[in-house]
Amino acid sequence: IGGKIMGFYMLTTLLAILSSTGIFYVFQPGDPRLASKLTADVSAIASSDVSISIKDTIVNIIPSNFVKPFLESNMLQLIFLAILIGIALGKIGDYSKILKDIFEACNSLFLKITVILVQFIPIATFASVLTVILKTGPDVLLSMLAMLGTFTVGIIVMLGIYCLLILLIGHLTPVPFIKKYSPTMLQVFGLASSNAAIIVNMDACEHKLGIPKKIYSLSIPLGATVNMDGTCIYLVIFGMTLARIFGVEISGGMLLSMFFSVLVLSVGAPGVPGAGLVCLSVLLTQMQVPLAGIGLVMGMDSLLGMMRAMSNSLGDVAASLIVAKSEKILDMDCLLYTSPSPRDT
């Protein structure tokens, strides 16, 4: 069961990255003329015109020292170091538990700091958006609407992909699923957090969709951590849009590097409001895009966070439904009819 759940999560993550990339190239949001208005440092824009080959991407994964990846926020090199340290921890015996506890404590510390800082995002958002509008005029509003519209299309396309997977893999009509889960989707939209949505998703799985506890007790909490399809769409569309605005050339090597970074960031993103903005700043640094463009996104991030959480949760529940059907333990009466099934009586 665990293998099926993880396999489905990896499939939908890949589809989210590929579909959002295609949607970006179709609509191509972002006006390059905004770059000179978003930052006064013209040299920063000129120097950001880089081209990275696939060979360079692979070679540059290995850092020259242990300090440089942290100073440069090089995501691929940090991942390499994390894997290397993890392998080494497994070979040092009893000391590994001590170091593991230290790493977990540091992770909890920085996550708590992030949660505290997120509380100040509305103030920073107001100041940032006001500054950007005063500098750029109405052009920035049109660009923001174009990005929001493109992201919305990405979310709708992902919903269609979930329905298609339910039909093709689960051999179920997606109509009852959407009909039964729609009220919960609105709840998740209001919560704007994958972690906060765990309880309501579990309740929907059991009482509305007929998914047994042995499935959703694993798939929903796991999905809230590793299955972030909405976050993938967000990172790809806004990362590539800001790269286009600032004139950063997206070569094949950079696209490959971005895909890998998006995959890791989406898996590692905490399911709390505002976490997507933090991940986007990391991705922009990796792509050598000036962080001045964050101001374009901050004004919309509360709405974007709600849409991300809704898409993330929809993927988790769709996976639970398909796996339950494949295991032949899905309560079809509960899914297809509004009356309570024998399990609920």
Predicted segments with their positions:
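Signature of multi-pass transmembrane helix bundles
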Residues: 4-176
